[in-house]
From Swiss-Prot:
Pfam families, A to Z: Pantoate_transf
UniProt: Mg(2+) binding residues: 52, 91, 123
Organism: Azobacteroides pseudotrichonymphae genomovar. CFP2
Function: Catalyzes the reversible reaction in which hydroxymethyl group from 5,10-methylenetetrahydrofolate is transferred onto alpha-ketoisovalerate to form ketopantoate.
Functional pathway: Cofactor biosynthesis; (R)-pantothenate biosynthesis; (R)-pantoate from 3-methyl-2-oxobutanoate: step 1/2
EC number(s) stated in the UniProt entry for this protein: 2.1.2.11
Protein name per its UniProtKB record: 3-methyl-2-oxobutanoate hydroxymethyltransferase
One Gene Ontology term, aspect cellular component: cytoplasm
């Protein structure tokens, strides 16, 4: 019997672990504001991620690096007011945990205390294990992120597929096993070969959520604005657009502009 039914009033980490054991795929999407999050939470979504991708889609930056911890907390506070059923996870932004495990746990505690989020997500493997240990020791549920890690874009040199070479794939597998051993409840795998995604998912007992990691992982995540077709210039191979909101919004606003210019809005029924 599938675990995921409309009877579940609040998705928990235990539900996600059980979903993997039942081979039931996990759905995950980003949200950054109250209005969109309100809709998402009525769809049966399992996980809502307040992603540092807000730096791109909300603030217009070319990378995730500029967004601050205070900004992430502000976005997450708005989303928390709307999300009641899905598990709410918040990205730890660049600079909030790298190289300083004490700072990492302080940042994670701030996120949980000030937003009411259910969990945090953190990028990296062996190099951040001390930060992960401290965060978990504070009782904060933690999701990992391996493969293409956007906060390391300057080191990686671009947004190309990761772990194609045998030694790179082995290192990713080791990092995934380490994160599970430390106590992470799930890991995002971004832009890696589908075969490797399958191998990691089969090796680990915790759920692996893919974005460009093939169909064999335990769930999928996309950026909301991307899957709704709002950003016409962003079209990676892994993205499936479920709507064309760019043109819907553009035509709607153009229609409004013309109605105002032609004195067709408001009409008598729309006036007091």
């Amino acid at each position: 019997m599938p675990l995921h039914t409309g009877d579940i009033r609040k998705i928990t980490i235990q539900h996600l672990i059980e979903m993997k054991s039942y081979c039931e795929k996990i759905s995950m999407i980003t949200a950054y504001d109250y209005s969109m999050a309100s809709i998402i939470d009525k769809t049966g979504m399992d996980i809502v991620l307040v992603g540092d991708s807000a730096s791109n889609v909300m603030a217009g930056n070319t990378t995730t690096l500029p967004i601050t911890l205070d900004q992430m907390i502000w976005y997450a506070q708005s989303v928390r007011k709307a999300v009641q059923r899905a598990l709410l996870c918040v990205d730890m932004p660049f600079g909030s945990y790298q190289g300083n495990s004490k700072k990492a746990v302080h940042s994670a505690i701030r996120i949980i205390k000030e937003t009411g989020a259910d969990a945090i997500k953190i990028e990296g493997g062996k190099e951040i294990c001390e930060s992960v240990k401290r965060i978990l020791s504070a009782g904060i549920p933690t999701m990992g992120h391996l493969g293409l890690t956007p906060q390391s874009i300057n080191k990686l040199g671009g947004y190309s597929i990761q772990a194609k070479k045998k030694d790179e794939a082995q290192r990713l597998m080791e990092d995934a096993c380490l994160l599970e051993e430390l106590g992470c409840f799930s890991i995002v795998l971004e832009k890696i070969p589908a075969k490797l995604g399958k191998q990691v998912s089969e090796k680990l007992s915790i759920p692996l959520i893919g974005i460009g990691a093939g169909p064999y992982v335990d769930g999928q995540v996309l950026v909301l604005q991307d899957m709704l077709g709002i950003n016409k210039s962003f079209a990676p191979r892994f993205l499936r657009c479920y709507a064309d909101l760019y043109n819907v919004i553009k035509k709607s606003v153009e229609h409004y502009v013309q109605d105002v210019k032609n004195a067709n809005f408001p009409n008598e029924q729309e006036s007091y």
